[in-house]
Amino acid sequence: MTQISLELIPRTRSGLRAELAAVREHFPSVGTVNIPDLTRFSTRSWEACAFGRPHFRTIPHVRAIDLNPGEALPMAEPMAAHGIEDVLIITGDAPSDMTRRVYNVDAEQAIRRFARELPHVRVYAGLDPYRQSFAQERDYLERKLDAGAVGFFTQPFFDLRLMEAYADLIPEGAEVWWGLTNVTTEGSVNYWASRNRAVYPRSFEPTLEWNRRLAGDALHFARERGQHIYFQPIRTDVVEYLGGIL
């Protein structure tokens, strides 16, 4: 059965609580919340996920480059205390000003460490359709599965045809969470194209209507395949974006 997650940004704790309450009120089909670990905010992802328990299954993002190999995993105890049993591990980008200490740890190494030290935790990895060739990304996915990942959260897609291509490449048996987001300003269009090298179809329009139509089509795509989906509302009211779709 298809599960649905919302990716929420922990800008403030009060704001996050309000968003979680809105999701509970308007979207009873949403059973999961995933939260990125953004170093510009004071609340770490696993701390933010605690606010969603026990009403939601919560999945904190963990940046591999933040994990000090010589110290205990800082999220292990908070996760256990709040019954958080899933993580999404990405390598992470180094801070531009280098004021924050990072380590020479990649996603594969971090996945192996979680599998070794927290074997009860389900580990997801990232799938990025824009960073390298199809064959290179497929091989990278297989290495992360070998390291101990159970499945993948994808970067947001903007084209169902590209989703179909990757659906055929993902190793059989891996759990998949397809990613969608809303891009409704020229700034967002340029950000995704330049920073993440996203590919837009010719039919793309930076309107809420176009993004809502894609969200509905992608949800149907995931349900047809028995896979999962998450939505990443960016500076948009989640009810306006997904109301009537979920």
Tell what function each PLM region has:
Residues 1-5:
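Extreme N-terminal starter segment of soluble prokaryotic enzymes
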